[in-house]
Swiss-Prot record:
GO cellular component, one term: nucleus
Database matches in Pfam families: Cyclin_C, Cyclin_N
GO biological process per UniProt: cell division; G1/S transition of mitotic cell cycle; positive regulation of DNA replication; premeiotic DNA replication; regulation of DNA-templated transcription; regulation of protein localization; traversing start control point of mitotic cell cycle
InterPro entries per UniProt: Cyclin, Cyclin-like_dom, Cyclin-like_sf, Cyclin_A/B-like, Cyclin_C-dom, Cyclin_N, Cyclins_cyclin-box
Listed SUPFAM superfamilies: Cyclin-like
Family indicated by similarity: Belongs to the cyclin family. Cyclin AB subfamily.
Gene name in the database record: CLB6
Source taxon at top rank: Eukaryota
Keywords: Cell cycle, Cell division, Cyclin
Job of this protein: Involved in G1/S and or S phase progression. Interacts with CDC28.
Protein name: S-phase entry cyclin-6
Transport among keywords: no
Region (Disordered) location: 63-91
SMART domains to which the protein is assigned, alphabetical: CYCLIN (SM00385), Cyclin_C (SM01332)
Amino acid sequence: MNCIPSPISERKIQINNEDCIGKENAFHTIPRESSINLTPHSTNEKKVLSEVNSNKIDSLQLPRGKLQRDSTHLEKTRKRQLSNDSTDPIEPKTVKKIKCHQWKNLDSIEMDDPFMVAEYTDSIFSHLYEKEIQMLPTHNYLMDTQSPYHLKSSMRALLIDWLVEVHEKFHCLPETLFLAINLLDRFLSQNVVKLNKLQLLCITCLFIACKFEEVKLPKITNFAYVTDGAATVEGIRKAELFVLSSLGYNISLPNPLNFIRRISKADNYCIETRNMAKFIMEYSICCNKFIHLKPSYLAAMSMYIARKIKNENSKWDETFIHYSGGIDIESDPAFKDFISELVEDIAVPDTNLDSLRLKYKKPKHGMVYFKVFDWCKQKR
């Protein structure tokens, strides 16, 4: 198998014995902590445009308290003009501009398409926003050095980089990679794993994700082969049962790509922007600084950066707030901080993710890495 990536054991990476946590058991379970409850922000309601005596004023939106007074004023003016036999059109002398917080209902355009199930879209995504909170790791076990499950960021980066390479060689779906990383992080956030069992855990998470997402998955012998002896077929099967039971068989992840596609609707489905957003989102998921953030939040961050790369003057208006699940940049100062941190990490990486960069340098992914990297380097 020429396409099989080199095992971790052949890579020039030094691992200290102190990186290994846990001496007695390969997988040692400690009770799971409660996850943080995050709820998406609510969106602003539509204001209704009014008609005054059959004269439609499309560009002016009037407050409710002012509507009746202006209507009476226009009626008096009209009678006065008619009494003077004037034929000039009646127009207000001044028009006060009123800021209107509205979002465009783009789902209504797809009502006639049965495949888009537009009438159920809001209910579906409301469920996904609730479900994604349940699928988060209990905490960021990489950044929390006081955690009993703490693992060095360099070790996770090594595992993720190898996982991306194996995923690419097996020609799996993007959703499979995201689910595998989610399973890995959730398990490591509540279990202590010995160093020599980390690769077994990594390939097992990919094996579970393939079973869940793929129509035709590689043979289990191929999963064991790419580990170069670190995992056996029997070992993968036993680890699979242990991982699933530890996670309560809860593996239905609201996929980050669903949120990217949702926000992309507000961007008129721009292919170039969405390709850049896919790379940025995949990078953020692989990066050790953002594993505690919701997929919808990472999707919004990725689309925001991608749109800025495409057009520096792009705005995150009410439509984007609605289709991102209520993420308002102006009222969320942490959002801008995470954006700056992500841009900085892409420009000057803290972790080794060479396989991911190489993946998005290829023509089949639009070679978007170069454009994203150049922009981030200028903005850092």
